[in-house]
Amino acid sequence: YNVLYIYSIEGNKLEEIERVNYSLVDIVDLNGKGTYGVLVALNDGGAQTPTSKLYLYKLIDKLECVYEKSYDGACVVLEYGKVAKNQTGVYYVRTSDYSKLNAELLLKKVSGGFEEQMTSSFTYLNTASGFSNIIKDVDGDGVLDVRTLVAPVEDTKRNVAEFLQVWKSWDGDVGLDNVYGLIENATDGYDLVLPKDWLGTVRYQYV
């Protein structure tokens, strides 16, 4: 794991006040007004089956852990932000075997910490971007989206990066809605955007 060192500043002096172990970390504005917290995922690969923990620390008089949750599988993506127009949360993406991913959506509670809302599972297909491009705002509406990849119906030697990307957004309940479909065909030199109404049943192949 890595170590995050936290210091206080008094005049021109730095004083170490805390050390936090982490595998993934994000410094987040908890209320949009400059109240910051430290969001940490810590993986434990020592066991036969990997596990991980999610922590939220707040600096009150000292650094305090205000939320903790254990999960099966290693955390590979930790992303905090808007998950709906008026809702903030965190996507915690974990895996036990790197062939299937589980995206946990946790909603921020007014009282502090998070509340588990849903889990979505999908097959992981490795691309050059690895895990860095799985959660992002793909359509510019300010809300985080989840990327899944759909393989062609036939066996293909195409690069996985040319597979159909289906981006999904939280449906406000316990699932994800399709919002955007894209094929980036670098081999033949075109991009193809698919209407979201097609994405629930679409099948395709390269010829």
Question: Where do the protein language model's features map onto the residues?
Answer:
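Extended non-catalytic domains of envelope/secretory-pathway proteins
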Residues: 72-95, 114-115, 182-184, 188
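A short beta-strand motif characteristic of beta-propeller blades
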Residues: 12-19, 64-70, 118-124
